[in-house]
Regions:
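Start-transfer (signal-anchor) and selected internal transmembrane alpha helices
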Residues: 1-42, 235-236
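Membrane-lumen/periplasm interface segments of specific transmembrane helices
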Residues: 18-31, 52, 193-316, 320, ...
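Transmembrane alpha-helix segments characteristic
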Residues: 317-338, 343-356, 365-377
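Short hydrophobic/aromatic helix or loop-helix immediately within or flanking a transmembrane segment
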Residues: 51-103
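Short acidic/glycine- and proline-prone juxtamembrane loop motifs at membrane-interface regions
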Residues: 155-169, 343, 347
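Transmembrane-helix signature of polytopic, membrane-embedded enzymes
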Residues: 99-111, 122, 127-153
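Membrane-interface transmembrane helices that cradle and orient dolichyl/undecaprenyl
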Residues: 176-187
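Transmembrane alpha-helices of multi-pass, membrane-embedded glycan-processing enzymes
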Residues: 79, 83, 87-91, 106, ...
Length: 392
C-alpha cells in the first residue's frame, strides 16, 4: 500500500474511533428519546446494541430476521435488499461461531456493524484512487487532500458506523466509477450491482458505463464516429447498465406481483412501488417537503447544498470529470426537490465534486467554514444519534 493510501486509512480509523467513542459514551449516559430499540432488544439491550439500532436500521433488521430477507410490510419496499441480506449473513456467521442454533438480534447488529465499518473504511481510499484517475496530473498529495477531508469531517458520521446504506454504497459507488474509467468494465458491473442493491439511486451508476465506454471516446476525438471495438463496447455498456438497474427492477417487479392489482400505484402509467411508498410513508414528492415545519431540516443541511452548488458553479472540469458533475447535480436536484432534504447530510460522502472543491479552495472562507461546521456537526450528530433524536 502506498504512502498516501496508508495515511488515508490511518486518518479514517482515527476519526471513526473518535465518532464511535462519542456515540457509545452518549448511548451509555443518555436515555433514548424513543424506547423502540430497548423494547425490541429486551434482554439483549446494552449501550452497543442500542447505539446501532436506530432509524433505518429497524427496517433493515426486520428484513434481515426474515428467513429470506424479503419485506413483510409495504413500507419496507423503500429499502433495497442489500443491507438486510448483509446483516442476515453476518448474523448467521456469528451464530455459527458461537455454535448457536438461533439467529439473535444482538449477533446480527454487532456483526453487521463491524463489517459495515470495515467496508466504509474504503470510502476515502476510493475517493483518493478515483481522484488519481479523474485528474491524472494531480500529485499524490493533491489527490489525497479530498479523501483526507472526507475521512476527517463527514457530515453524518453515525451512518458510516452502523449497517446503513451510506457505509456500503459510498465506497462501492466510488469504486464503480473508478473501475469504469480504468477499463475494468466487467468487474465494475459486478460492483455496480452490489452498490445498486443497497440504494435505489444506484441505478444512476449506469451513466458512468454509458459515458465512459460510448460517449467519452467520441468527445475526445471530436468526430461523430464509432469508437474502436464498438460491438464490444456496446456489450459492456449494456452489461453495466443492466447491472445498475437490475436490483431496482427486481424489487419493483416483486412489489407489483405481491401488491397488485389492489394497491393504488398499480393503475399508474409507470407503476413504481418505490415512488408510491416514498410518498405515502415519507411524504416524498415534488416540493412536498417545502413547508414551514421542515425549516430546521433545511437549515441543518444547508451547508451541504451551498458547497455542493458552488462546486457545480466552479467546476474543475475535464472529460473524465464530466459524469461526476452531472450525477452530482442530478443528486442535489433530487434531494432538494423530491426527497427529505436532510438526507443530503448522509449523501455528501458520495459526492466527489463537493470534496474536490473544498480541497482545492482551503484558502477560501466558505471551504474553511464548511470543514469547521462538518467537524462540529459530526460530533453533535453522534450525540443526537445515541439519544435517538433527529435528523436521521
Amino acid at each position: 500500500m502506498k504512502k498516501w493510501e496508508k495515511e488515508i486509512i490511518k486518518t479514517t480509523i482515527k476519526c471513526k474511533a473518535v465518532h464511535a467513542s462519542i456515540v457509545l459514551v452518549a448511548s451509555a449516559i443518555l436515555s433514548s428519546f424513543d424506547t423502540s430499540a430497548e423494547i425490541l432488544l429486551g434482554s439483549q439491550t446494552n449501550a452497543l446494541t442500542r447505539s446501532i439500532l436506530r432509524w433505518d436500521v429497524f427496517h433493515f433488521l426486520s428484513r434481515a430476521m426474515n428467513s429470506y430477507g424479503g419485506w413483510r410490510s409495504e413500507h419496507e419496499i423503500a429499502f433495497m435488499p442489500g443491507i438486510p441480506l448483509l446483516m442476515r449473513g453476518c448474523g448467521l456467521v456469528m451464530a455459527t461461531i458461537r455454535d448457536a442454533h438461533t439467529l439473535t438480534l444482538s449477533d446480527t447488529l454487532i456483526a453487521s456493524a463491524f463489517l459495515a465499518n470495515l467496508i466504509s473504511l474504503l470510502a476515502p481510499l476510493e475517493l483518493y484512487r478515483l481522484t488519481r484517475v479523474v485528474y491524472p496530473h494531480y500529485t499524490p498529495a493533491q489527490a489525497a487532500a479530498p479523501a483526507l477531508l472526507m475521512a476527517a469531517c463527514p457530515p453524518s458520521p453515525p451512518s458510516l458506523l452502523v449497517p446503513y446504506t451510506e457505509a456500503v454504497y459510498t465506497p462501492l459507488a466510488l469504486m464503480t466509477a473508478r473501475m469504469v474509467a480504468e477499463g475494468s468494465w466487467l468487474t465494475a458491473s459486478l460492483v455496480a450491482f452490489a452498490a445498486a442493491s443497497t440504494r435505489a439511486n444506484g441505478c444512476l451508476l449506469a451513466g458512468f458505463f454509458l459515458y465512459e465506454i460510448l460517449i467519452r471516446p467520441v468527445l475526445e476525438t471530436r468526430r461523430l464516429c464509432f469508437p474502436p471495438r464498438i460491438i464490444n463496447r456496446i456489450a459492456f455498456a449494456s452489461l453495466g447498465t443492466i447491472a445498475s438497474f437490475a436490483p431496482l427492477g427486481y424489487t419493483q417487479t416483486e412489489a407489483y406481483a405481491r401488491l397488485c392489482p389492489q394497491a393504488p400505484f398499480c393503475t399508474r402509467t409507470l407503476p413504481l412501488a418505490y415512488s408510491y411508498v416514498q410518498g405515502k410513508y415519507w411524504d416524498n414528492g415534488l416540493l412536498r417537503y417545502w413547508n414551514v415545519s421542515q425549516i430546521p431540516n433545511f437549515l441543518l443541511s444547508l451547508p451541504v447544498y451551498v458547497v455542493g452548488i458552488v462546486a457545480i458553479c466552479n467546476p474543475h472540469m475535464t472529460l473524465r470529470a464530466l459524469p461526476h458533475y452531472v450525477l452530482h447535480t442530478l443528486t442535489l436536484i433530487l434531494l432538494l426537490c423530491f426527497s427529505n432534504v436532510q438526507i443530503a447530510l448522509r449523501f455528501a460522502t458520495a459526492l466527489p465534486p463537493l470534496w474536490w472543491w473544498v480541497a482545492a479552495h482551503t484558502d477560501s472562507r466558505l471551504a474553511r467554514s464548511f470543514v469547521a461546521w462538518s467537524r462540529l456537526w459530526g460530533c453533535v450528530a453522534c450525540v443526537l444519534w445515541a439519544a435517538f433524536l433527529p435528523p436521521a
